[in-house]
């Protein structure tokens, strides 16, 4: 029997989704433990400094424990080159990322000597489905701060065309033209109802990120908007509207105004079925466990 420790290091919306899926779709001979010291396999979530992951892997190795790394971010970390992470990945039993890490290694001239699982994050179609609401918000966005997730650009563009933004956060003093859901991130049914009231959903995270709202919003009939980056196109090609990031606010705001001035492409049943298949948490989590055992 494999004893696995998969608990998140912090209360993070995205990591919690991964943890839930790993537990829900694990083989019957996996036992989950809440004490890291009792585990044969420890899942680590890499979203910040490399050294913390590296120190943990070294400590686990000294205790004859294996580590699996979920590479949540790379370009936005203080160690943004693949060479910085090679020793981490090579020591891990498995590395899972939405990034094509072997391809990035090859582009940077680095060897690929690690067990890799290339997979996206997922969506639960049981909860995320379209409801019959008026789409009174031009776009829904998850953003805690004015300068994060492109909230400033989104709100500026929406105000220019006289439309309202829905922010999936607690209320803040960001001025008119924004409404708030309050903290509902752990309530999938409520999230789905709000997504169903949005014409667009924002996937406008700068630098990197998988952007769960893209696929959750799509299942609820909201068309995603993403920056035109390879890490987004590889998963969302044909599903999202892409706008350039490189030109900054001077280019982003007019691109958003152009989209907000037109009705979004309707999300078809075929697209929803594609999302269900491509981003199925069951398939994704089972693939992880198969590679751990493989």
Where are these regions (language model features)?
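N-terminal pre-catalytic "stem/leader" segment of glycosyltransferase-like enzymes
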Residues: 1-56, 225, 229, 245, ...
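Short alpha-helical donor nucleotide-sugar binding micro-motif in glycosyltransferases
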Residues: 89, 193-198
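Aromatic "clamp/platform" in nucleotide-sugar-dependent glycosyltransferases that forms part
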Residues: 206
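Conserved catalytic-core segment of nucleotide-activated headgroup transferases in glycan assembly
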Residues: 124-126, 132-180
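A charged, aromatic-enriched C-terminal amphipathic alpha-helix characteristic of glycosyltransferases
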Residues: 247-250, 261-293
């Amino acid at each position: 029997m494999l004893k696995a420790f998969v608990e998140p290091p912090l209360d993070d919306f995205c990591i919690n989704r991964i943890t839930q899926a790993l537990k829900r779709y694990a083989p019957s001979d996996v036992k989950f433990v809440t004490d890291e010291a009792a585990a044969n396999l420890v899942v680590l979530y890499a979203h910040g400094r490399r050294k913390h992951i590296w120190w943990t892997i070294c400590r686990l190795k000294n205790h004859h424990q294996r580590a699996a790394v979920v590479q949540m971010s790379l370009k936005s970390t203080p160690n943004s080159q693949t060479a910085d992470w090679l020793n981490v990945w090579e020591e891990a039993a498995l590395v899972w990322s939405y990034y094509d890490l072997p391809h990035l290694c090859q582009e940077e001239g680095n060897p690929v000597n690690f067990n890799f699982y290339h997979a996206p994050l997922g969506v639960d179609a049981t909860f995320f489905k379209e409801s019959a609401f008026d789409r009174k918000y031009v776009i829904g966005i998850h953003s805690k701060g004015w300068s994060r997730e492109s909230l400033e650009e989104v709100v500026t563009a929406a105000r220019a065309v006289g439309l309202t933004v829905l922010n999936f956060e607690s209320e803040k003093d960001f001025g008119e033209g924004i409404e708030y859901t309050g903290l509902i991130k752990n309530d999938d049914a409520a999230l789905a109802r709000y997504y169903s009231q949005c014409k667009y959903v924002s996937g406008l995270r700068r630098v990197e990120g998988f952007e769960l709202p893209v696929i959750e919003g799509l299942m609820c009939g909201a068309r995603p908007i993403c920056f035109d980056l390879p890490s987004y196109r590889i998963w969302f090609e044909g599903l999202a509207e892409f706008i350039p990031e490189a030109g900054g606010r001077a280019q982003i705001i007019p691109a958003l105004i152009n989209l907000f001035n037109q009705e979004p492409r309707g999300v078809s049943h075929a697209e929803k079925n594609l999302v269900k298949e491509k981003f199925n948490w069951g398939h994704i989590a089972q693939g992880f466990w198969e590679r751990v055992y493989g």
